[in-house]
Amino acid sequence: MNKIVCVLALMVVMLSSCEKINILDIKTTYCTATINGEEYKDVTTVREELGRRGYPFATKGRIFIGTNNNLAYIQFQLSDANGKICYYLFGGIPFGKEENFPILNKEYQLYCHPSFDISDKPAEKIADDYLEFQAQETSSMYPSGILVLKKYSDIISSSYEMPCPLSGTLIFTEYNKKNHKYSGSFKLQNMKSSGSLSYDVKGELKVH
């Protein structure tokens, strides 16, 4: 009996000394990215995520498979070191009908054809429209994916900057069976035209 009392007393002391952690406030990092030498992160808590709005797609998932085509959609909300939201990085990656996306260590190609204009397209339609464009306008049997970088300030700022399509590669390198997350990396650049900004983007992701 005395032993049981001692054990219970010890547990009370241990519990009272532990810092209480609210599950809603646990941080999750989905993406870290360097844009022109500056570091950004898509990191959030469950509490913050519940209140966030304005994602390019009508879901808060960072990666999800389309229902009507063979497209994997990707979206990240990138903030600076002070937590200020600065960019959205979003788009889609096509994959084969028999492919179990994503395949580890496969380089998924991202390329925006110069003739494809995204200026008048809703964000959530860009990836689908680009897949259709490639089917109609190019002879490639293996369509490329597309990722777009968009300044968050565009929504509230009078100085509008066009969303910028990027080209490069994205690769998934690891799958964690415990938390069902895929890890990977990407390297992206835009095709600079007259008067446009040049972007060099690279980073890592952890998604499920």
Model-based region annotation:
Residues 2-8:
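Sec-dependent signal peptide recognition
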Residues 28-44:
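Post-signal peptide N-terminal segment of mature Sec-exported envelope proteins
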Residues 167-208:
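C-terminal or internal capping secondary-structure element at the end of a domain, subdomain, or sheet
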Residues 14-17:
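C-terminal motif of bacterial Sec signal peptides marking the signal peptidase cleavage site
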Residues 31, 49-174:
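Surface-exposed helix/loop patches within compact recognition domains
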